[in-house]
């Protein structure tokens, strides 16, 4: 259990801080090691950052960001996981780590300075978060 928790924390930390800051541009970093993984989405506005690491197979990551300085970090180590994140506004941050298989995480954030963290270290878990406004924080851990 500790090893899984440590691995999830390491993935979130690594992907959240791995992207370099650019003066006016967007940053997208994608690493996929297994077969049949896919990433989609888009970024509008300025200084958006997206980092995705998918180690297993048949994982899907979707991230859309609109506004300024939004950050999304998705790490999926298992297989058949879905992470679907949508952010609009300023300085919103979402981090998703799915270590097991067949997990789903869906997040929507609008406003400013909102933070969502989802860690799912099991199989077949589902989490959905919707935040609107400013300075909201949600953390979900499912073992």
List the model feature ranges, each with a label.
Residues 18-20:
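N-terminal signal peptide c-region/cleavage motif recognized by signal peptidases
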Residues 9-16:
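Bacterial N-terminal signal peptides
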Residues 24-143:
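Low-complexity repeat regions of mature extracellularly deployed or surface/particle-associated proteins
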Residues 1-9:
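Bacterial N-terminal signal peptides that target proteins for export
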């Amino acid at each position: 259990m500790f090893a899984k928790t440590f691995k999830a924390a390491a993935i979130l930390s690594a992907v959240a801080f791995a992207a370099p800051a650019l003066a006016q541009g967007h940053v997208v970093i994608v690493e996929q090691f297994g077969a049949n993984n896919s990433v989609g989405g888009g970024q509008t506005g300025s200084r958006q950052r997206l980092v995705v690491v998918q180690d297993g197979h048949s994982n899907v990551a979707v991230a859309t960001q609109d506004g300024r300085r939004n950050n999304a970090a998705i790490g999926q180590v298992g297989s058949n996981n879905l992470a679907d994140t949508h952010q609009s506004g300023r300085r919103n941050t979402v981090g998703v780590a799915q270590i097991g298989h067949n997990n789903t995480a869906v997040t929507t954030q609008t406003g400013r300075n909102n933070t969502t963290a989802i860690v799912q270290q099991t199989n077949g878990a589902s989490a959905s978060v919707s935040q609107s406004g400013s300075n909201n924080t949600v953390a979900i851990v499912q073992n």
